[in-house]
């Protein structure tokens, strides 16, 4: 490894796709189930083994319904292309299919993006708070996987502090239309009275809990929760005065429900076209309103083509959510100003960190010179040389070697470069004569 390789600055980089750049059909293919994130981080780091950069990259993966993002810090200048290639290979998606939807954000752009995401400015639901918890979970997972280092740790700690500042000093989260509220609004377009409908929730996570809260407020005729873990499903149903049912009963009982909201962590659809066709037939073509908030999707997309079935995904709900975002543009401007200031602060810290390897290398080189000359002096003393002469030789050798680099650089430099070096050296050696003092007299 050469000197230049060892002194390359660490660079921040974010690679990802989100609801702005890719439809749900692609987002679900690049999503990482929680149990896959640690192994994925390990394979990502292995990509850089054998590269000229001296350090394995720091990395964290954020995977939600609306985004899959890889945050990394590396001194490998080929990291951008390598990261995109890795994501393509890992998910077995052709690079030419994935690349048009991928954003690659270096340095300050990566910092700004992280701050905006955590603050809810990049969310489908402007100002929503769920993303902050998801980002904290991503950081915790990266830490447990051993892929979080100084740079990303500092980035995320600053990110969480900025999110707290934005939410505490602006109205960014006020009057926001959540995905859950948007689902209720859509249901009201299909059914005049949600209170007369039977509602089924599939899953028992945070998103289903939010949806159940909003639908329960409408006083539905019946509220049922089906979950893979029966105990958790029963607990959630009890909270809202509903009842639980086994997930295995879903195909046989789907026809009983007018509204079905699903959001599970399943990697494959749990509601297929055939099951819904049978449910529609059993209902004698009374409409079914279905909301699929999962990524990857819980409901096969072909279901949406059935007559009397109204199927909506997270992207469909986004249109309703955006209607409520326009009224909070003043808060957005205020939040963006805060973020911009904090980005500059972080970049100052990053710039300061960039000189650490240089200083460390200077110390290492100087110490190597010192040890070599001390060893030479010891040998001179051992053979009986005069101590004063040995000390004089030691000091002369150290002086010559320590100033060899600067003087060689000055001798090689020309014109403006030489003037800049002279000014730089003057700062190093406070008693160096000014240029005018060195001219011929």
From Swiss-Prot:
PROSITE patterns: GLUTR
Catalytic activity: (S)-4-amino-5-oxopentanoate + tRNA(Glu) + NADP(+) = L-glutamyl-tRNA(Glu) + NADPH + H(+)
Residues annotated as catalytic: 65 (nucleophile)
InterPro entries in the record: 4pyrrol_synth_GluRdtase (IPR000343), 4pyrrol_synth_GluRdtase_dimer (IPR015896), 4pyrrol_synth_GluRdtase_N (IPR015895), GluRdtase_CS (IPR018214), GluRdtase_dimer_dom_sf (IPR036453), GluRdtase_N_sf (IPR036343), NAD(P)-bd_dom_sf (IPR036291), Shikm_DH/Glu-tRNA_Rdtase (IPR006151)
E.C. number(s) listed in UniProt: 1.2.1.70
Disulphide connectivity of cysteines: none
UniProt pathway annotation: Porphyrin-containing compound metabolism; protoporphyrin-IX biosynthesis; 5-aminolevulinate from L-glutamyl-tRNA(Glu): step 1/2
Any Pfam family the entry gives: GlutR_dimer
Binding locations of NADP(+): 203-208
UniProt site positions, description: Important for activity: 113
GO BP terms, alphabetized: protoporphyrinogen IX biosynthetic process from glutamate
Enzyme class: oxidoreductase
Keyword terms, alphabetized: NADP, Oxidoreductase, Porphyrin biosynthesis
GO molecular function (one): NADP binding
Function (record text): Catalyzes the NADPH-dependent reduction of glutamyl-tRNA(Glu) to glutamate 1-semialdehyde (GSA).
Family label: Belongs to the glutamyl-tRNA reductase family.
Assembly mode: Homodimer.
Note in the entry: During catalysis, the active site Cys acts as a nucleophile attacking the alpha-carbonyl group of tRNA-bound glutamate with the formation of a thioester intermediate between enzyme and glutamate, and the concomitant release of tRNA(Glu). The thioester intermediate is finally reduced by direct hydride transfer from NADPH, to form the product GSA.
Record note on domains: Possesses an unusual extended V-shaped dimeric structure with each monomer consisting of three distinct domains arranged along a curved 'spinal' alpha-helix. The N-terminal catalytic domain specifically recognizes the glutamate moiety of the substrate. The second domain is the NADPH-binding domain, and the third C-terminal domain is responsible for dimerization.
HAMAP family: Glu_tRNA_reductase (MF_00087)
Name of protein: Glutamyl-tRNA reductase
Species in which this protein is naturally found: Burkholderia pseudomallei (strain K96243)
Gene name of this polypeptide: hemA
């Amino acid at each position: 490894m050469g000197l230049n390789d060892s002194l390359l600055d660490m660079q921040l980089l974010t690679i990802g796709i989100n609801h702005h750049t890719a439809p749900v059909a692609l987002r679900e293919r690049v999503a990482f189930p929680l149990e896959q994130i640690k192994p994925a981080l390990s394979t990502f780091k292995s990509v850089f083994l054998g590269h000229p950069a001296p350090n394995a990259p720091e990395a964290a993966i954020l995977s939600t319904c609306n985004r899959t993002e890889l945050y990394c810090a590396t001194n490998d200048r080929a990291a951008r292309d390598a990261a995109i290639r890795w994501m393509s290979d890992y998910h077995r998606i052709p690079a030419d299919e994935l690349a048009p939807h991928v954003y690659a954000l270096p340095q300050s752009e990566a910092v700004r993006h992280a701050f905006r995401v955590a603050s809810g400015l990049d969310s489908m639901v402007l100002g929503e708070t769920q993303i902050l918890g998801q980002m904290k979970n991503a950081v915790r997972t990266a830490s447990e996987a051993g892929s979080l280092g100084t740079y990303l740790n500092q980035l995320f700690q600053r990110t969480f502090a900025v999110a707290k500042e934005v939410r505490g000093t602006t109205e960014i989260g006020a009057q926001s239309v959540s995905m859950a509220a948007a689902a209720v609004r859509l249901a009201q377009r299909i059914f005049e009275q949600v209170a007369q409908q039977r509602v089924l929730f599939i899953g028992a996570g945070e998103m289903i809990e939010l949806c159940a809260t909003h639908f329960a407020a409408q006083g539905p005729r019946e509220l049922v929760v089906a979950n893979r873990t029966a105990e958790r499903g029963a607990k959630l149903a009890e909270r809202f005065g509903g009842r639980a049912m086994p997930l295995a009963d879903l195909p046989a009982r789907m026809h009983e429900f007018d509204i079905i909201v699903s959001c599970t962590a399943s990697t494959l659809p749990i509601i297929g076209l055939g099951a819904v066709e049978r449910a529609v037939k059993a209902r004698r073509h009374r409409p079914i309103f279905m909301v699929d908030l999962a990524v990857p999707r819980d409901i096969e997309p072909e279901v949406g083509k059935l007559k009397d079935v109204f199927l909506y995904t997270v992207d469909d709900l986004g249109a309703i959510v955006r209607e409520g975002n326009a009224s909070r543009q003043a808060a957005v401007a205020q939040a963006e100003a805060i973020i911009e200031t904090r980005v500059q602060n972080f970049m100052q810290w990053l710039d300061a960190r960039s000189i650490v390897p240089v200083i460390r290398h200077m110390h290492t080189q100087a110490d190597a010179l010192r040890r070599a000359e001390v060893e030479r002096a010891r040998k001179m003393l051992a053979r009986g040389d005069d101590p004063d002469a040995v000390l004089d030789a030691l000091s002369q050798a150290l002086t010559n070697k320590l100033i060899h680099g600067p003087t060689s650089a000055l001798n090689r430099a020309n014109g403006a470069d030489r003037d800049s070096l002279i000014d730089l050296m003057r700062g190093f050696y406070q008693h160096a004569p000014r240029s005018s003092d060195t001219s011929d007299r």
